[in-house]
Amino acid sequence: TDYSDLAAQCLPQVVSVTNVIEVTSTSNGGSDLFNFFYGNGQNQNQTSTQESEAYGSGVIIGKTEDELLMVTNHHVAVYDKTGNTMYYSYTASTKERKVTFVDGTEVEANLKGADSDADIAVLAVKLSDIPEDTLNAISVATIDNSDDVKVGQGVMAIGNALGLGQTTTFGHVSALNKDVTTSDDNVTRSMMQIDAAINAGNSGGGLFDANGH
């Protein structure tokens, strides 16, 4: 079966999301080993700041007079962690968010709203920041009712798999209403199970039916 027309229809509705994370580490001044390698020899706390990037996906769900709106996962859009080890403590939080459209154009995005319990977030990009050619290349997704999904129907997943850009995978709906308890926040959610390949970076991406909805 040829799904090229379906892919061509849906790819413009999906974006890649880059979360730029700022990590600040502070050494424990009392750690002789850490101070030996990273300190100033005076047994004082040392602070360093670095940046890293995390990748995910999003789906274009609306356009206002001023903004383009995209839905993604909370854990893709928001990063906020603190921790301690024997040698240092650290904080890591989102510094900025960027989205990349189907034509490769990358622009800064703002967090419009988020719900960590539902693991959902909405990003917004100013229309004035998007080139006209890009606006003509992208489109808004059609959202259908998940209550109408049936076991066995075909699906196409699109996302920024492994942070390497948009990828399409195909499969079927394997089961519905699966109660799954997540390991990170111990929240139980009712899930749809599919057998299309889903990789790191697909989070927040689109799952489309045969009509491209």
Task: Annotate each language-model stretch with its function.
Residues 1-213:
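Serine-dependent protease modules
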